[in-house]
Swiss-Prot record:
<dbReference type="GO" id="GO:0016655">
    <property type="term" value="F:oxidoreductase activity, acting on NAD(P)H, quinone or similar compound as acceptor"/>
</dbReference>
<dbReference type="InterPro" id="IPR056147">
    <property type="entry name" value="NQRA_N"/>
</dbReference>
<dbReference type="InterPro" id="IPR008703">
    <property type="entry name" value="NqrA"/>
</dbReference>
<keyword id="KW-0520">NAD</keyword>
<dbReference type="Pfam" id="PF05896">
    <property type="entry name" value="NQRA_N"/>
</dbReference>
<dbReference type="InterPro" id="IPR056148">
    <property type="entry name" value="NQRA_2nd"/>
</dbReference>
<dbReference type="Pfam" id="PF11973">
    <property type="entry name" value="NQRA_SLBB"/>
</dbReference>
<keyword id="KW-1278">Translocase</keyword>
<comment type="function">
    <text>NQR complex catalyzes the reduction of ubiquinone-1 to ubiquinol by two successive reactions, coupled with the transport of Na(+) ions from the cytoplasm to the periplasm. NqrA to NqrE are probably involved in the second step, the conversion of ubisemiquinone to ubiquinol.</text>
</comment>
<protein>
    <recommendedName>
        <fullName>Na(+)-translocating NADH-quinone reductase subunit A</fullName>
        <ecNumber>7.2.1.1</ecNumber>
    </recommendedName>
</protein>
<keyword id="KW-0830">Ubiquinone</keyword>
<comment type="subunit">
    <text>Composed of six subunits; NqrA, NqrB, NqrC, NqrD, NqrE and NqrF.</text>
</comment>
<keyword id="KW-0915">Sodium</keyword>
<dbReference type="InterPro" id="IPR022615">
    <property type="entry name" value="NqrA_C_domain"/>
</dbReference>
<keyword id="KW-0406">Ion transport</keyword>
<comment type="similarity">
    <text>Belongs to the NqrA family.</text>
</comment>
<keyword id="KW-0739">Sodium transport</keyword>
Length: 447
């Protein structure tokens, strides 16, 4: 077992009951274009077109062969674009149950499945987009050969669902999905799980199960990759979430695209925090209707640390998200708040007297607790960074856009979520995820 000691389990109220319930009926679903880094679409549909579940909506010009398909049957109601014609979302009004189907495979056939056949089914069904590559965190290229593939069956994000609860409902599909994933590489498949959790193992020779314990970010794939098979500019690995492995298994066992998702609907503003069953790309306006306390709430697709704000054309469940978090908008100003005792505030530096009650949970809001200021190296980043890098130096280089130095300090290993805790504890209120993405984009462009 690998035990992570540096990090932080956010003491936030609103943790979900680890029991699966049916979610609200969803009337609209969407594919969010900006989730797919560097993607440039060639559209296959127009507004008012009728589409079947699994029908191609668009293809990626920058990653030829990667298809994006409809998560439900219905009518294309909106194709939203932003600045420079960037695709924001393709919105479908759900109606009917028509779908495109594929061939079925027995367990014996899966064990000897041809790699090209596995790729063909995943690509044509649109499920290939579940596979992402490090470095750069883009959808995996169809002609690439990864050193290894990581299956993330652990989640230490604040307010997250327990993967073991969800996998227990889909054991056969999960095992079949692992068989499919193992056909995509000559290297190892690392299944990373919480220490002591009941995630099933596999008899496949390529599959290795590794346990991680300790505090967040013990559950992030960046942590797993760093410890088990680190990447470089010339070496890539792929990774996939446990619910997408289940979807792979359902696809090959039944021939039907599986878009069900079990997510955590939680946070201080949720009346009844719990696990709910919904579908990929679900409208969060529909999903949270009647679920929230009155007030000015911020709905977040994903973790409170690294998720995306859900509003307008982006008010849908993200492709890679398995939780919806809700916080109160922290718009209030507090006079001389920095000298108050802070019995109801949390600080990693023990600035407030609340640290005398270490087990207390807080009704956190979106407030940053102050305005932007200088980056102050007081050891906060080192407290929450478990990877073998020098965080203060790396973060400084990211802000100053010193790409060469940032690359030498380990920027290629990281994704925005890996720096989310650094952003949270930063006295200067900097967004390090955005700075990292700018750096990675520059590195990729310059080769």
């Amino acid at each position: 077992m690998i035990n992570i000691k540096k990090g932080l389990d956010l003491p936030i109220e609103g943790a979900p009951q680890q029991v699966i319930h049916d979610g609200s009926t969803v009337k609209r679903v969407a594919v969010l274009g900006e989730e797919f880094i560097g993607m440039r679409p060639t559209m296959h549909v127009r507004v008012d077109d009728q589409v079947k579940k699994g029908q191609v909506l668009f293809e990626d010009k920058k990653n030829p062969g990667v298809l994006f398909t409809a998560p439900a049957s219905g009518t294309v109601k909106e194709i939203n674009r932003g600045a420079k014609r960037v695709l924001q979302s393709v919105v479908i009004e759900v109606n009917g149950s028509e779908q495109i189907t594929f061939g079925t495979f027995s367990d014996a056939e899966l064990s000897s499945l041809d790699r090209e056949k596995a790729k063909e089914v995943l690509i044509q069904s649109g499920q290939w987009t579940a596979l992402r590559a490090r470095p750069f965190s883009k959808v995996a290229a169809v002609d690439a050969n990864p050193s290894s593939i990581f299956v993330t069956a652990i989640d230490t994000n604040p307010l997250a669902a327990d993967p073991a609860v969800i996998i227990a409902e889909n054991v056969q599909a999960f095992e079949a999905g692992l068989a499919v994933v193992s056909r995509l590489t000559d290297g190892k498949v690392f299944v990373c799980k919480q220490a002591g959790s009941q995630v099933p193992s596999s008899s496949i020779a390529q599959v290795e199960v590794h346990e991680f314990g300790g505090v967040h970010p013990a559950g992030l794939v960046g942590t797993h990759i760093h410890h088990l098979d680190a990447v470089s500019i010339s070496k890539q690995v792929w990774h996939i979430g446990y619910q997408d492995v289940i979807a792979f298994g359902h696809l090959f066992l039944t021939g039907e695209i599986y878009t069900d998702r079990v997510i955590s609907l939680a946070g201080p503003r949720v009346k009844n925090p719990r696990l709910v069953k919904t579908q990929l790309g679900a409208s969060l306006d529909d999903l949270v209707a009647g679920e929230l306390e009155d007030g000015d709430n911020r709905v977040i697709s994903g973790s409170v640390l690294s998720g995306s704000i859900s509003n307008g054309v982006h008010a849908f469940l993200g492709r890679y998200h398995v939780q919806v978090s809700v916080l109160l908008e922290g718009r209030e100003k507090e006079l001389f708040g920095w000298i108050a005792p802070g019995s109801d505030k949390f600080s990693v530096t023990r600035t407030f007297i609340s640290h005398l009650a270490p087990s207390r949970l807080f009704k956190m809001t979106t407030s940053t607790g102050g305005s932007k200021r200088a980056m102050v190296p007081i050891g906060s980043y080192e407290r929450v960074m478990p990877l073998d890098i020098l965080p203060t130096l790396l973060l400084r280089d990211l802000l100053s856009r010193d790409v060469d130095s940032a690359m030498s300090l380990g920027a290629l290993e990281l994704d925005e979520e890996d720096l989310a805790l650094c952003t949270f504890v930063c006295p200067g209120k900097y967004e390090y995820g955005a700075a990292l993405r700018d750096c990675l984009t520059t590195i990729e462009k310059e080769g």
